From Swiss-Prot:
Disulfide bonds: none annotated. Component of the cytochrome c oxidase (complex IV, CIV), a multisubunit enzyme composed of a catalytic core of 3 subunits and several supernumerary subunits. The complex exists as a monomer or a dimer and forms supercomplexes (SCs) in the inner mitochondrial membrane with ubiquinol-cytochrome c oxidoreductase (cytochrome b-c1 complex, complex III, CIII). The lineage of its organism: Eukaryota, Metazoa, Echinodermata, Eleutherozoa, Echinozoa. This is Cytochrome c oxidase subunit 3. Belongs to the cytochrome c oxidase subunit 3 family. Its EC number is 7.1.1.9. It is found in: Mitochondrion inner membrane.
Length: 109
């Protein structure tokens, strides 16, 4: 069945990294010396990273569903739109974050 084993492994790793990122972000929030109510910086930080975190959670959930579907042979070489849509969403989140970071750095300089 082609590269199914490699696809399962790669998708598992992607989901694991998404979960790891979410845990690190929660830890960062817990350990932060400021709150959302402290200043404009705190508000901006928590809103920007919070929206990104929510999108990562959504993306990870979509990819986790795709992983279960892949393991259960729900995808084929011609029938895999759910996975393709989840992958596009995951990449969209990456592009938005890259643009957002660039804009914050540019505006901050």
């Amino acid at each position: 069945a082609g590269n199914r084993t490699e696809a399962v492994q790669a998708l598992f790793l992607t989901v694991a990294l998404g979960i790891y990122f979410t845990i690190l972000q929660a830890w960062e929030y817990y350990d932060s010396p400021f709150t959302i109510a402290d200043s404009v910086y705190g508000s901006t930080f928590f809103v920007a990273t919070g929206f990104h975190g929510l999108h990562v959670i959504n993306s990870t959930t979509f990819l986790l569903v795709c992983l279960f579907r892949l393991i259960n042979f729900h995808f084929s070489a011609h029938h895999h739109f759910g996975f393709e849509a989840a992958a596009w969403y995951w990449d969209f989140v990456d592009v938005v974050v890259a643009f957002s970071l660039y804009m914050h750095i540019w505006w901050g300089s």
